[in-house]
Design a protein with these regions (language model features):
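Alpha-helical scaffolds flanking conserved acidic
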Residues: 213-225, 253, 277-285
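Post-HEXXH active-site segment of zinc metalloproteases
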Residues: 236-261
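Divalent metal-coordination and catalytic microenvironments
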Residues: 135, 259, 319
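Peri-catalytic and regulatory segments of divalent metal-dependent proteins
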Residues: 31-224, 236-239
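Short active-site segment of divalent metal-dependent hydrolases/proteases
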Residues: 228, 232-236
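A structural signal for well-ordered alpha-helical segments within the folded catalytic domains
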Residues: 87, 221-222, 229, 257, ...
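Solvent-exposed alpha-helix faces
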Residues: 264-265
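Long, well-structured alpha-helical subdomains associated
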Residues: 1-35, 40, 268-387
Length: 387
């Protein structure tokens, strides 16, 4: 890295600090000592590790504490748990870009925005070739909650030394419909996050084995795609032109699709180096599920704000639907048979998400009729940004 690049990264780090300072204090503000105490005294974490299978080592909790203690925190409002998540994701993306010969320009300052809003963002840093890439604390929590709800909803069946997952929408919906805990999970996923206090009001749940293994794959897929999407904006210099002008960007929609396609391509490049590629990621199923669920949080919030449209009974938001359909036309050199299978997987998962929200929508309308208002939430925000 040249002296110029090093100086630009320092400017980007300071710019990220200024972005963090825009947010008021919230219940997610924690010091490193607070987080370490939480890890040491949390039996739920030991229970979680036990769900990862016979090969899961009890030492993982001790290793987590050591890693958290060693995690550098560039800015005053960084906290080690979420910052380390984003740090590892960004390191993975940057390493893949270097191997693939994708220029990272002046570099990226990354971290977590201290808010329960659902945001994944890239900010161009003026006068430099750098960007700030951030996931919000709320977004990280939402991905975790979504991975639990979806993994637990998919029927799992042992097949020798492996697991068979039944992703057929009818079977997934049957499982959800027959389990009150699963129904509550999905109700909270859209409702609590739309209301604005998802991370505060959603109880910490431990997904049992073997669903926990699927949950980890889904969580990884949601987070890695989101970060890769923001890096795509940085690589393509999206934001640099807008910062010099006024008004909206007429090419915003096409830029989002471009970023989605870059992200899925880079994620496939990363996964092809592993022995067992993450099927939820390489198929594009997890990315489209994430896009749809963010859209449904937006729709649920509209209900709580009294701005619901009775016609919106499925995910027909033009931008979201256009982005979801773009995955069908981007085969990225994948063999035709595999591309068809990937498309079927995406469509099956989309059908599940559409059906779940359609069934929950009347309940959210009833909540509004009973007096629930989004303005009543002390941490209300406009959720659902992945752009």
């Amino acid at each position: 890295m040249s002296d110029r690049d090093d100086e630009e990264i320092k400017i980007a780090d300071d710019f990220r600090r200024q972005l963090q300072e825009r947010f008021p204090a919230y219940e997610g503000d924690r010091t490193k000592d607070d987080v370490l105490d939480w890890v040491k005294g949390n039996p739920k974490l030991e229970e979680f590790i036990s769900t990862l299978g016979e090969n899961a080592r009890k030492e993982l909790l001790d290793e987590m504490q050591v890693e958290l203690e060693a995690t550098p925190l560039p800015n005053p409002r960084d906290e080690p748990f979420t910052h380390r998540i984003v740090q590892e994701l960004c390191n993975t993306i940057e390493s893949a870009c270097r191997r693939a010969g994708v220029p990272l320009r002046g570099g990226v300052a990354y971290g977590v925005s201290p808010t329960f809003a659902l945001n994944a963002e890239q900010h161009h840093v003026p006068t430099t070739g750098t960007s700030v890439v951030e996931l919000s604390a709320g977004f990280i929590s939402f991905c975790s909650h979504l991975s639990k709800a979806l993994s637990w909803s998919i029927p799992h069946e042992s097949a020798g030394n492996s697991l068979k997952l039944d992703r057929q929408p009818a079977q997934v919906l049957k499982r959800i419909g027959g389990d009150s805990e699963l129904k509550r999970l999905w109700l909270e996923l859209f409702g609590a996050y739309a209301y604005g206090e998802g991370p505060l009001s959603v109880e910490m749940r431990i997904v049992p084995h073997p669903y926990s293994l699927t949950r980890m794959l889904l969580l990884r897929a949601f987070e890695l795609f989101a970060v890769a999407h923001e890096y795509a904006h940085h690589v393509a210099e999206h934001g640099a032109m807008e910062s010099l002008g006024v008004g909206g960007d007429p090419e915003a929609s096409s830029k989002e699709i471009e970023a989605d396609m870059f992200a899925i391509s880079l994620c496939r490049y990363i996964e092809q180096e592993g022995k067992q590629p993450n099927i939820f990621l390489v198929s594009g199923a997890a990315p489209v599920v994430l896009l749809k669920c963010l859209d449904y949080v937006r729709r649920t919030r509209k209900i709580f704000a009294g701005r619901d449209s009775s016609e919106e009974t499925s995910s027909t938001h033009p931008e979201t639907e256009e982005r979801v359909l773009a995955f069908d036309s981007y085969v990225d050199g994948i063999p035709p048979g595999l591309a068809v299978n990937f498309q079927r997987t995406r469509h099956d998962f989309c059908a599940v998400i559409d059906s779940v929200w359609t069934k929950l929508r009347p309940l959210y309308l009833l909540m509004y009729e009973d007096g629930l208002r989004v303005e009543d939430s002390p941490v209300a925000w406009l959720p659902g940004s992945l752009g």
